[in-house]
């Protein structure tokens, strides 16, 4: 005997489905934004916004210097404005890091020296007072661009914007930060022979390589950013591989080892 079961109509089936789906736990709603508008964020985080503006100016002047046909700022003027904006950025950042506290004692000086912001403040001032060296603009420009991208994603997230550019910026900064730090470290190292060559060509100051050596020593000893030490270690390993190669002439191999020993003997201890 076949049992006849009445099929539910469409209304009943949809209501049943809605009831079953309603009984399942729904995902929690996203948290409300911390700030209702960008202006509110700016009012609450004025220093961060000033730093962002200074970094944008650094990138702007760098583009005018590297791409002269933009024509908004003369190239020679743009070069020095790169380092002026960079010096302002790192001075403000250093002020934030030391929380506005200032003292003329050894403890404060030691605390100041280990700050990366102090290193790049010195870097910016040194090249602000020297003849133009195009490669010198690269580190501060890359740093400014990276921090500007990070700030843009932060302010858009915290003000409730859901633009598709936010995850792209976050992904870009996450994937490219290490590459950018490596480029910065290598450019800072390769500036040393370039500055020495400028002396022999009559375009550089005798004091510039010595001042720059102090900066590079500070970067090598940095605790927060080991990219300079890593770059030196990678270069040392590559040169040692070349020197140990059977195809490398003995005088060249000896010269490489002497250069490695000379540079290693002058490496400062890590702070």
From Swiss-Prot:
Gene name in the database record: npp-25
GO CC annotations, alphabetized: endoplasmic reticulum; membrane
Keywords for this protein: Membrane, Transmembrane, Transmembrane helix
Domain of life, source organism: Eukaryota
Gene Ontology biological process: endoplasmic reticulum tubular network organization; membrane organization
Low complexity compositional bias, start-end: 13-25
Membrane spanning stretches: 56-76, 125-145, 180-200
Protein name, UniProt field: Transmembrane protein 33 homolog
Membrane topology field: Multi-pass membrane protein
Similarity annotation: Belongs to the PER33/POM33 family.
Subcellular location(s) per record: Membrane
Disulphide connectivity of cysteines: none
Disordered, as annotated region: 1-32
InterPro entries: PER33/POM33_regulator (IPR051645), TMEM33/Pom33 (IPR005344)
Subcellular location, principal: membrane
Pfam families in alphabetical order: TMEM33_Pom33
């Amino acid at each position: 005997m076949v049992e006849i079961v009445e099929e539910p109509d469409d209304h009943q089936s949809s209501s049943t489905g809605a009831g079953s789906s309603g009984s399942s736990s729904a995902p929690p709603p996203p948290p409300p934004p911390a700030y209702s508008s960008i202006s509110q964020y700016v009012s609450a985080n004025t220093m961060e916004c000033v730093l962002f503006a200074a970094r944008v100016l650094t990138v702007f002047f760098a583009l005018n210097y590297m791409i002269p046909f933009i024509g908004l700022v003369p190239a020679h003027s743009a070069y020095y404005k790169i380092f002026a904006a960079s010096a302002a950025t790192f001075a403000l950042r250093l002020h934030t890091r030391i929380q506005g506290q200032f003292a003329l004692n050894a403890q404060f000086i030691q605390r100041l020296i280990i700050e990366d912001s102090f290193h790049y403040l010195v870097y910016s001032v040194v090249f602000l007072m020297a003849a133009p060296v195009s490669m010198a603009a690269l580190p501060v420009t890359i740093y400014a661009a990276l921090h500007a991208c990070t700030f843009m994603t932060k302010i858009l997230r915290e003000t409730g914007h859901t633009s598709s550019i936010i995850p792209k910026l976050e992904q870009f900064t996450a994937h490219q930060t290490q590459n950018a730090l490596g480029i910065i470290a290598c450019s800072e190292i390769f500036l040393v022979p370039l500055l020495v060559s400028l002396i022999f060509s009559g375009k550089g100051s005798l004091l510039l390589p010595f001042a720059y050596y102090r900066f590079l020593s500070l970067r090598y000893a940095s605790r927060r950013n080991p990219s300079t030490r890593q770059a030196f270690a990678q270069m040392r390993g590559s040169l040692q591989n070349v020197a140990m190669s059977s195809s490398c002439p003995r005088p060249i191999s000896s010269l490489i080892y002497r250069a490695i020993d000379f540079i290693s003997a002058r490496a400062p201890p890590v702070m």
